Regions:
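Short, well-ordered strand-loop elements centered on a beta-strand within folded domains, enriched
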Residues: 109-118, 128-140, 244-250
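Structured surface patches comprising rigid loops and adjacent beta-strands/short helices at the edges
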Residues: 112-128, 147-160
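Flexible, gly/proline-biased loop segments at the beginnings
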Residues: 1-125, 166-169, 254, 291, ...
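Short, surface-exposed beta-edge/turn micro-motifs
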Residues: 97-101, 133, 199-200
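Extended, charged amphipathic alpha-helical segments
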Residues: 3-8, 139-278, 282-292, 301-338
Length: 338
């Protein structure tokens, strides 16, 4: 039996089988070492930077959180220990990251004068291996520059988790895939539009009458056909060429019938569902003839089912601290006079 490589005819592989891979674990879910003890503090179970990034990219996701924040802030009554401005910062951190932190400010005699919000992204719970019980406020990723705050000076509000009780996690994690999908659909459409309303193509040329200089000029023109060059015309002259000497083979067609609108609508509905905020309170434009229903009724139900439980979570801190830090008034809608 002769060897194929010894005949001078190189063996060619014309068939290649590949796959797109398996589902990858999204970074915002954390890793197998959730709340790992590094000797100083416990690591966070959820990537905080990813949560903030999605807040700035997801339209409905951001709108729902800000709607809750505005209603909560409107019902808060400033106390001797907490101002409205500090409460708004605290509530925003609590809604987005699942954690809210207040640190006490004391006078020289140790009396608490008030509370200031601490950004939850930089707060870490000290581990049992550390000699003191409290929290680290990380100014950077270097532990040497962190501020240590005793536990007695911190009010930690957190949304509950099923696997750990060190940190809270936001209750909307199940909807982050939809927020990612919504953002990806918008990003793809924007890049598709900037690219000249095409997703790329292959230039297949068999015309030998075009020299290398002309080919280089043609390539330069194709490279410039983006953004402001979308409507640029390309003139190519080949007197003895064939009609099919140059072909444009689209890599993928993205026509008006693509699923962009369906993806946007379905993912938006998912985000509204996970946040349980009525669309009429978020500025959503109705598409059905019946509209979005009575906004006043929706606001009253929303306040009873969503806002009051959050208020109750804040009020529990009053009992834990032994003083009135939080105070709320009932949520009411203004009546427009005739």
């Amino acid at each position: 039996m002769s060897d194929l490589n010894s005949t001078g005819n190189e063996a060619r592989t014309d068939l290649e089988i590949f796959s797109w891979g398996y589902d990858e674990r999204l970074s915002w879910l954390g890793a197998a070492w959730e709340c790992a003890d590094n000797g100083h503090y416990y690591e966070l179970p959820v990537n905080q930077e990813d949560l903030i990034g999605l807040l700035r990219a997801g339209v409905h996701h951001s709108s729902a959180l800000h709607c809750k924040l505005n209603v909560l802030t409107s019902t808060f009554e400033p106390t001797a220990l907490l101002s409205r401005a500090e409460f708004k910062k605290l509530a925003f951190n609590f809604l987005v990251t699942g954690n809210g932190y207040l640190s006490a400010e004391r006078n020289r005699f140790g009396k608490v004068l008030g509370f200031k919000n601490r950004l939850s992204v930089y707060m870490r719970r000290s581990s049992k291996k550390y000699e003191k019980d409290g929290y680290f406020y990380l100014r950077s990723h270097v532990i040497a520059t962190a501020d240590f705050i005793p536990k007695s000076d911190v009010i930690h509000l957190m949304q509950p988790d099923l696997v750990q009780e060190v940190y809270g996690i936001p209750d909307y994690l199940a909807g982050l895939s939809s927020a990612e999908l919504n953002r990806s659909a918008t990003t793809f459409r924007r890049r598709y539009y900037d690219n000249g309303s095409h997703a790329g193509f292959i230039v297949y040329a068999t015309d030998n009458n075009i020299n290398n200089d002309d080919w280089n000029n043609l390539k330069d023109q194709f490279k410039k056909a983006q953004r402001e060059g979308n409507f640029r015309n390309v003139f190519l002259r080949s007197p003895d060429g064939k009609s099919d000497g140059i072909k444009l083979i689209p890599i993928s067609e993205v026509a008006a019938k693509d699923d962009f609108l369906n993806i946007k609508n379905v993912s938006a509905q998912d985000m509204l569902t996970i946040h349980r905020v009525p669309p009429s309170l978020m500025g959503v434009v109705p598409t059905a003839a019946g509209g979005l229903g009575d906004a006043r009724t929706a606001a009253e139900v929303f306040a009873a089912n969503e806002i009051e439980p959050i208020q109750a979570a804040f009020l529990e801190a009053n009992d834990a601290f032994g003083a009135e830090v939080f105070r709320f008034k009932p949520y009411t809608l203004a009546t427009v006079g005739k």
